[in-house]
C-alpha cells in the first residue's frame, strides 16, 4: 500500500487526492488529506464570495472525492511552525507528502500610511465575511462614507460588491451573524475601485464586472476620459500591425463604455455608487486623527509598451476605509525550501527541490507550486502533473518503512485531529445555527465554536 499525505484540503489538495485515485499504475493507494483547519475546502469555503452560490456549489464535487473510502480527511492538524508536525516527521509517517498549502499572504502596496487603522488587505476583509476562524472579529470602518479598493482583479470586484450589497440580499447567504449585522449598518456610500493601469489590462472577468451593474440601488460611475487614455480602448478589434484584444478584454471595454456613455438612470432613493477608476497609482495613504482619511494617487498614462508612466499629476481620494487587492503570495513552511522571489517552493514537475536536487517523497501542487495564477480548475492539471511524478517514483517510495497507523502517531504527538464525522457535526451545527436565526446555513466564525461543534458539544 502506498501511503500519501496531502497537506491542504482546498481545490489543489482535493484534486491531488483525486488524481492519486484515478491513476492506474499504483492500484493500492491510501491518502490522508491534512488541514490546519477543522473544515475542508480551503478557499472554496473561505475565499469565494458568499453571494456566488454557483462557485460555492463546487463543494459538492470536492466532497465526493473526500468521501471516497480510500481517502481520510484529517483536520485540525498543524504542519510546520511551533507545535506543528515537521516535514521530516511527515516523511516518517507517509511514503510521500504533497504540499498544497496555497498562497495565503497578500501583497503589500509598500507605501507610507499602509499600516494606518482603517487600512486592510482584501484577504483580511474576505476572511472576516467568510467566517475564517483566524479573522479579526471586527475593526472594519463600515461607519465610513467612502471606501477605496486598490486593484482591478476579481478579488477587488468581490469586496466592492459586498461593500455595496444590501444586508437583505446577504441574509440569504452563509455570512456569519456579526459580519451581516455590520454590513447591514454600513454607511459606505461611495466605493472607488482603482487600478494603476488602463481598462485593457484589468484582470477582472466580464461576468464579475456585470454583476456590479446589476446591484439594486447602486449606480456605476465611469469617467470616459480615463477609458479614452487607453490606446487599446480606441480600437479593441485591432488594426494594421495591431493584434485584436482578447475577447474578455473587448467585452470588459464594452461594459465600461456603456457605463461611461450611457450611465444607468439613478434608482429611486439612490444609496450607493461604485466608481471604476483607472491610471491611478497609490503613493500614500493619508492620515487624519490617527486613522486613514484618503489615498493619494499619482496619475499615470500609457508608456506605449504595455506599462504606464507617471504624469507628474496627483489626485487625493477621500476614504475612511482602504482595502488592497493587488495579489497573493506564498509564505515559507518551516522545514521546506522556499523561493522568496516567487513566493513558491522550488520544484521540478512537482518534485520538491532541495539545493537543486529532487527530494524523495516530497511534492508540491497548486499555488505554492506555480504561484497564485489561474482559476480553480487550473489546479486540476497542476495536480495531475505532480501525481504523475509521484507515481513514477512510487516503486522506490513504497519500499520505505513508514508508521502502520499515522493517525495514532499524530495523536501521540499531541495533535487532536478532526476527522470527517467531526466535519459533518460542524455542518449540522451550522445548519442549526441558521435555523435559530431564521436563515439558511450560517457559518461558525471562531475556533472554539468549530471545535465544540466537531465534538458534538452545544454552543
Q: How does the language model describe each region?
A:
Residues 4-26, 157-163:
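N-terminal Rossmann-like FAD-binding beta1-loop-alpha1 element of flavoenzymes
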Residues 30, 38-96, 253-270:
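N-terminal Rossmann-like dinucleotide/flavin-binding domain of flavoprotein oxidoreductases
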Residues 30, 161-309, 390, 394, ...:
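Dinucleotide-binding/catalytic capping subdomain of oxidoreductase cores
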Residues 96, 100-107, 153-154, 319-332:
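Glycine-/small-residue-rich beta->alpha transition segments that form the dinucleotide
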Residues 106-185, 343-355:
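Glycine-rich dinucleotide-binding loop and its adjacent helix/turn
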Residues 117, 351-459:
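C-terminal, flexible cofactor-proximal segment of oxidoreductases
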Residues 118-136, 285, 291, 303-370:
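FAD-site-proximal beta/loop scaffold in flavoenzymes
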Amino acid at each position: 500500500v502506498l501511503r500519501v499525505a496531502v497537506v491542504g484540503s482546498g481545490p489543489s489538495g482535493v484534486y491531488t487526492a483525486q488524481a492519486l485515485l484515478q491513476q492506474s499504475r499504483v492500484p493500492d493507494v491510501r491518502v490522508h488529506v491534512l488541514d490546519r483547519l477543522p473544515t475542508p475546502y480551503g478557499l472554496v469555503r473561505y475565499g469565494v464570495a458568499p453571494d456566488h452560490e454557483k462557485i460555492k456549489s463546487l463543494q459538492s464535487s470536492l466532497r465526493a472525492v473526500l468521501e471516497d473510502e480510500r481517502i481520510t480527511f484529517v483536520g485540525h492538524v498543524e504542519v510546520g511552525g511551533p507545535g506543528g508536525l515537521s516535514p521530516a516527521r511527515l516523511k516518517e509517517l507517509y511514503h510521500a507528502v504533497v504540499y498544497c498549502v496555497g498562497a495565503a499572504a497578500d501583497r503589500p502596496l509598500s507605501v507610507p500610511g499602509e499600516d494606518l487603522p482603517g487600512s486592510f488587505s482584501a484577504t483580511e476583509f474576505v476572511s472576516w465575511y467568510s467566517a475564517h476562524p483566524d479573522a479579526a472579529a471586527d475593526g472594519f470602518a463600515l461607519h465610513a462614507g467612502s471606501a477605496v479598493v486598490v486593484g482591478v482583479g476579481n478579488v477587488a470586484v468581490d469586496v466592492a460588491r459586498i461593500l455595496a450589497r444590501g444586508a437583505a440580499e446577504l441574509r440569504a447567504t452563509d455570512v456569519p451573524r456579526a459580519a451581516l449585522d455590520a454590513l447591514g449598518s454600513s454607511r459606505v456610500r461611495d466605493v472607488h475601485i482603482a487600478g494603476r493601469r488602463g481598462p485593457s489590462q484589468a484582470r477582472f472577468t466580464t461576468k464579475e464586472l456585470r454583476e456590479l451593474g446589476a446591484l439594486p440601488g447602486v449606480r456605476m460611475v465611469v469617467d470616459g476620459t480615463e477609458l479614452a487614455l487607453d490606446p487599446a480602448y480606441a480600437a479593441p478589434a485591432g488594426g494594421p500591425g495591431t493584434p485584436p484584444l482578447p475577447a474578455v478584454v473587448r467585452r470588459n471595454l464594452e461594459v465600461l463604455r456603456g457605463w461611461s456613455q450611457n450611465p444607468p438612470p439613478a434608482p429611486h432613493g439612490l444609496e450607493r455608487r461604485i466608481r471604476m477608476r483607472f491610471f491611478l497609482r497609490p503613493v500614500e495613504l493619508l492620515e487624519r486623527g490617527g486613522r486613514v482619511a484618503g489615498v493619494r494617487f499619482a496619475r499615470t498614462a500609457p508608456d506605449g509598451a504595455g506599462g504606464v508612466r507617471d504624469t507628474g499629476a496627483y489626485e487625493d481620494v477621500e476614504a475612511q476605509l482602504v482595502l488592497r487587492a493587488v495579489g497573493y503570495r506564498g509564505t515559507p513552511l518551516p522545514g521546506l525550501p522556499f523561493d522568496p522571489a516567487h513566493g513558491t517552493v522550488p520544484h521540478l514537475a512537482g518534485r520538491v527541490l532541495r539545493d537543486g536536487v529532487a527530494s524523495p517523497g516530497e511534492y508540491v501542487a497548486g499555488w505554492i507550486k506555480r504561484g497564485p495564477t489561474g482559476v480553480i480548475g487550473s489546479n486540476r492539471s497542476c495536480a495531475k502533473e505532480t501525481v504523475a511524478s509521484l507515481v513514477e517514483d512510487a516503486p522506490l517510495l513504497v519500499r520505505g518503512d513508514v508508521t502502520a497507523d499515522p493517525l495514532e502517531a499524530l495523536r501521540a504527538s499531541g495533535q487532536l485531529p478532526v476527522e470527517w464525522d467531526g466535519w459533518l457535526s460542524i455542518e449540522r451545527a451550522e445548519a442549526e445555527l441558521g435555523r435559530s436565526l431564521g436563515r439558511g446555513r450560517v457559518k461558525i466564525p471562531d475556533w472554539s465554536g468549530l471545535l465544540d461543534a466537531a465534538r458534538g458539544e452545544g454552543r
